[in-house]
Design a protein with these regions (language model features):
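Short intrinsically disordered, low-complexity coil segments enriched in acidic
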Residues: 1-2, 134, 146, 200
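Short histidine/acidic/glycine/proline-rich micro-motifs that form metal-
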Residues: 63, 173-174
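Short functional linear segments
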Residues: 2-61, 68, 74-79, 86
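Internal gly/pro-rich beta-alpha loop/helix module
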Residues: 165-166, 178-200
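Short aromatic/hydrophobic contact patches that present stacked aromatics
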Residues: 58, 97, 200
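Short active-site-proximal "capping" loops at secondary-structure junctions
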Residues: 63-65, 90-91
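ATP-dependent carboxylate-amine ligase catalytic core
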Residues: 31, 37-52, 78-162, 174, ...
Length: 200
């Protein structure tokens, strides 16, 4: 259900359709970055998210994040676990990013999730909005395991704001040096900051 426009300041009225959500995302800019966890933490706090309903794995690194995350989902499903997967970027449709047991999140679910996320924190970036929508979708899906692929680095990535139990690192190389640092050591240090107290 869409929220009233007054509950989403900064958004021109409620989002009634999947097309409305895509238009809002396009307005945010796919490649716009505003690094920091503040907006994510604000949204999660407003939504009362302190834990997710099952174990959570975050996959960070430079190369092979998406394939590693997909492999973990396949392995989990082979053992009979209901598994949610969040990856980026998408190839054809943003629905590819949010999957439960390999099934993309239906377009019909997007407006309600987007409105709830924006009501909690209107200033979310493209990636942050999709991340919060994913959290809300997975909360409602009764999963056994959730897997989140980090978008960029680890220290300030939106997925690092989520409560997680395990972080997996894929091979680390030179990428996004203007943001993450000039060399492998700096980039590895940024990604290593995805680790939180109590994680495996």
């Amino acid at each position: 259900m869409a929220c009233p426009s007054c509950c989403c300041p900064g958004v021109d009225g409620p989002l009634f359709s999947y097309a409305d959500v895509l238009a809002h995302l396009d307005g945010l800019g796919l490649f716009h970055m505003d690094m920091g966890l503040g907006r994510m933490e604000s949204a999660l706090r407003a939504l009362g998210v302190t834990r997710l309903p099952c174990p959570v794995v975050q996959v960070a690194g430079t190369n092979g994040k998406g394939s590693t995350a997909s492999f973990l989902q396949s392995l989990s499903m082979a053992h009979g676990f209901r598994t949610g997967l969040y990856t980026s970027p998408h190839f054809l449709s943003p629905t590819e990013r949010i999957r439960m047991d390999r099934r993309p999140l239906p377009e019909s679910a997007w407006p309600g999730l987007a409105n709830r996320a924006l009501a909690a924190e209107p200033g979310l970036t493209y990636f942050e909005l999709l991340t919060v929508m994913t959290v809300l979708a997975f909360q409602d899906a009764e999963p056994d395991l959730l897997i989140f692929e980090a978008g960029l680095g680890g220290r300030h990535d939106a997925t690092t704001a989520l409560p997680a139990d395990l972080v997996c690192f894929t091979p680390i190389g030179l990428d996004h040096q203007a943001v993450l640092g000039p060399d492998i050591a700096a980039i590895a240090a940024d990604k290593a900051d995805a680790m939180r107290p109590g994680m495996f």
